[in-house]
């Protein structure tokens, strides 16, 4: 809860600073001089409310959505030795990480992957793919589980949701400024908001949202290094490196993780060139090198 309060306070400060900065640079006067009557303070508050509402709502239903989108079966009563081992391992790792035991599940996928999600570190879900259980050693799976437990213990799901809330706020804010400017200045519409406003706003939201996702993905990549460190601490550096090397050997396999969960999986796929800016995970080679330097 303290993390949420501090982050919300920080984001409120960002909104206020943005409002003051725009006023100091005479942006209000510029818009008024061009016939655009827009209260930027009210617009910022409006965008912040809706920007954070969408992000936090997604966070609160993340466990339910993850189970539905991946067909994850939560283990309540273990039926096999794999399931028994999974429960015991997650319980041990959770205890060592200082969090409550999350729900544990298996999702039907040939690819080697795992994810963690949940709105609270003491009310989370950790799931692993059937393919990973079949092809990875117990030490490697334990390292992957430790990585996911690291995400939970670090509060990464909450942090990323709040970062997305900030991004949503400013995408909505600047898209509406652009929409008003196009409508009033370029199309000279003086009576209410015309079609140009709505078209320009939607177009700007799509473009700005795409560009701003690079910011969210940058935060996501930073989280992965921290989760790898947690995995190494809980399961051993050698096991964590071995798990990442095994993942690297299977990079040719398609990743079928839903887009909404890609940032929370251990395997984010491969991208080249400028597309690397929009990767949720650093390249596996970089993650392995970071662990080796850590020792």
UniProtKB/Swiss-Prot annotation:
Its EC number is 3.4.24.-. Gene3D superfamilies: Metalloproteases ('zincins'), catalytic domain. The chain crosses the membrane at residues 4-24, 42-62, 158-178, 195-215. Its cofactor is Zn(2+). PANTHER family: PROTEASE HTPX. The gene is htpX. This is Protease HtpX. Keywords: Cell inner membrane, Cell membrane, Hydrolase, Membrane, Metal-binding, Metalloprotease, Protease, Stress response, Transmembrane, Transmembrane helix, Zinc. InterPro entries: HtpX_protease, Pept_M48_protease_HtpX, Peptidase_M48.
